[in-house]
Regions:
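Active-site-proximal loop/helix segment associated with metal-binding centers of metalloenzymes
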Residues: 145, 170-217
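Conserved beta-strand hairpin/beta-sheet module of binuclear metal-dependent hydrolase folds
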Residues: 35-83, 205, 209-224
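Cap/insert and terminal regions of metallo-dependent hydrolase folds
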Residues: 92, 99-108, 123, 200-310
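Bacterial N-terminal signal peptides
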Residues: 5-16
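Binuclear metal-dependent phosphoesterase catalytic core
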Residues: 80, 290-291, 301-326
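Boundary at the C-terminal end of the N-terminal hydrophobic targeting segment
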Residues: 18-23
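Active-site HxH/HxHxD metal-binding segment of metal-dependent hydrolases
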Residues: 88-167, 179-189, 269-277
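Pre-active-site segment of Zn-dependent metallo-hydrolases
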Residues: 48-49, 63-92, 107-108, 114-116, ...
Length: 326
């Protein structure tokens, strides 16, 4: 009987350990080939066009994900054609938050891609709070401005599945969305815009602000839309909730264009301590703040550049800036 009990105990311990290893393995399954191409940002040259907006194509081990869709209806479509970037492979779109400068191009892009590939853009991934009613002050009152409430109906009518997340989730192998970011630090200031929550109007702190990260052998490749949660909060959230891996690359909008010198210094110190290895920031980051971060993080012109339209980050190679951003 004692042998039988010991045998069962051993089998139980083996099964528990195996399950634990399996869980860890499934959570961290690093991708090997990653390329990120900026399709919408403030800085552009050549035949591409710039705008106050953001969009990037993420290609990872044969998967294509579009991160945000730009401010104007045709910016992403036009820039992709100029750059010879084929977007018909896009099956998933991740939207960083509800602001129109990150999603106005989505419906026109859907129509354009479906003409060539009826299976393009099957899913749109957003964080909880994305479809809350929003208003901003105008004159003596307020006006509604979350256009995505109406856009949602059109997307669903076209057969697009919209998925909301309240926690970090792996949407494709090694590709994660953060869901709402834990805000430990008071990094961002919010104005008079408001949102309707449980029947009450409250200050809009953009709770749906989320990030996308790709797990690789060298760590996270993180994309922010505007960083309304705060870039430090976002990176700490990624490392604590998804995987405590290094931040191999950081790109997108960091919302530092109007940050004080004190805040820029604090942010640089934090990002240096976190260990950001490559930086390709644009949109609402600001040119001068990016230069401050480059210096503060001890990076160089080869590892920290403006994320202009056409700029790329290639895993295993690093940043490939356009001529205007070199």
């Amino acid at each position: 009987m004692l042998r039988f009990i010991l045998g069962l105990t051993a089998l139980y311990l083996i099964s528990v350990c195996a399950a634990d290893v399996s869980a860890k393995s499934s959570k961290k399954n690093p991708t090997q080939e990653v390329q990120v191409t900026i399709l919408s940002s403030n800085l552009a040259n050549g035949a591409t066009v710039g705008e106050w907006g953001l969009s990037a194509l993420v290609e990872a081990d044969g998967k294509c994900v579009l991160f945000d869709a730009g401010r104007h209806p045709d910016t992403v479509i036009r820039n992709a054609k100029v750059l010879n970037v084929d977007l018909t492979c896009v099956t998933d779109v991740v939207l960083s938050h509800f602001h129109f400068d990150h999603n106005t191009g989505l419906l026109p892009l859907l129509e354009d891609l479906r003409a060539s590939n009826p299976k393009a853009i099957q899913r749109v991934h957003v964080a909880s709070g994305f479809f809350l009613r929003r208003q901003y002050p105008q004159g003596d009152g307020f006006v509604d401005w979350n256009q995505m409430i109406d856009v949602r109906k059109k997307l669903e009518a076209a057969g697009v599945k919209i998925i909301e997340y309240n926690k970090p989730t792996e949407i494709l192998p090694s590709i994660w969305v953060s869901g709402p970011v834990t805000r430990t630090h008071d990094e961002q200031k919010y104005g008079k815009a408001r949102m309707l929550v449980d029947g009450k109007w409250v200050q809009d702190n953009v709770p749906d602000s989320q990030v996308l990260t790709i797990l690789t052998d060298k760590g996270h490749i993180v994309l922010l839309g505007c960083g309304h949660s705060g870039v430090v909060n976002a990176l700490e959230h990624v490392q604590s909730k998804i995987d405590n891996a290094p931040i191999h690359a950081l790109m997108g909008g960091l919302h530092l264009f109007n940050a004080s010198d004190e805040m820029l210094g604090w942010t640089a110190d934090k990002l240096r301590n976190i260990g950001v290895q490559h930086l390709m920031a644009g949109h609402c980051t600001g040119i001068e703040p990016l230069m401050r971060l480059r210096t503060g993080l001890n990076l160089t012109r080869k590892t920290a550049v403006v994320g202009a339209v056409g700029s790329k980050f290639v895993y295993g190679e690093g940043v490939r800036p356009t001529s205007i951003a070199m």
